[in-house]
UniProtKB/Swiss-Prot annotation:
The modification Phosphoserine is found at S45. This is Hemoglobin subunit beta. Involved in oxygen transport from the lung to the various peripheral tissues. The modification N6-acetyllysine is found at K60, K83, K145. The gene is HBB.
């Protein structure tokens, strides 16, 4: 499991508190579906995903992105227990949804890009390293039931 120092935890928590979590989640999920189109197969019920514009404007993508972001918020509040925080979601994604765990890493990387775009110069290389470490921890926790 990934270990974040007190300084890294502070950076992650502080940066997450500066963004509109719902907007960041919606943009990250939308970008995931555009950049990695094979991930769309898990969202058949979302309607029109035929183009970047359709995806980014899709209300179901935005709503699910909000859920994803709220889940990230839960993880940020529990950085010392990511495995426990994501145990039920890991089970759901593994046993029922059959999501390839690599998709969690992809989403984490896209989230880092969205954070960088949103925060600009405030998202320093040091802050990025801390945030990248956090999303890796979340992805690892979500993939736990796959092992």
């Amino acid at each position: 499991m990934v270990h974040l120092s007190a300084e890294e935890k502070g950076l992650v928590t502080g940066l997450w508190g500066k963004v509109n979590v719902d907007d960041v989640g919606a943009e990250a999920l939308g970008r995931l579906l555009v950049v990695y189109p094979w991930t769309q197969r898990f969202f058949d019920s979302f309607g029109d995903l035929s183009s970047a514009g359709a995806i980014m404007g899709n209300p179901k993508v935005k709503a699910h992105g909000k859920k994803v972001a709220n889940s990230i918020s839960d993880g940020i509040k529990n950085l010392d227990n990511l495995k426990g925080t994501y145990a039920k979601l890991s089970e759901l994604h593994c046993d029922k949804l059959h999501v390839d765990p690599e998709n969690f890493r992809l989403l984490g990387n896209v989230l880092v890009c969205v954070m960088a775009r949103t925060l600009g110069k405030e998202f320093t290389p040091h802050a990025q390293a801390a945030f990248q470490k956090m999303v890796l921890g979340v992805a690892t926790a979500l993939a736990h039931k796959y092992h």
